[in-house]
Amino acid sequence: MTSTTPARSDRPVRIGNASGFYGDRFSAMREMLEGGELDYLTGDYLAELTMLILGRDRLKDPALGYAKTFLRQMEDCLGLAIDKGVRIVSNAGGLNPHGLAVALRELADKLGIDASVAFVDGDDLVDRADELGLGTPLTANAYLGAFGIKSALDS
């Protein structure tokens, strides 16, 4: 059987992380981008408390529901990441990954930066809360794993 997976070089993939929670150090993204060679920079913004915060944001404004600090970090660091060839992977989209993707594309346009933006969705189960016996939660989300992220990186 022939593999359709492209051959990978023997060079290790260099991955850095700039966030462990929503509200982590704002400067961490720039520090990671300037601190050494990277292929990917990740950011984890989500936890149960964060989902509550994002849910309350979304109640006030349906266009929200994502980690706003990530957007500010990208305003500061998107050009640097592009210049260095670093691909950014984050779950900062929270309850509204499409909304964050739109905001990122608008930001890139405003900055005059040609950037590819992809997002993964499908984890929002709030519309199925009754069916799943969850009552009336503010948020209900599933962990999707890495397949969507891989597809986004491959696109």
What are these regions (language model features)?
Residues 2-134, 138-143, 148-150, 154-155:
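Metallocofactor- and cofactor-centric catalytic cores in central/energy metabolism, strongly enriched
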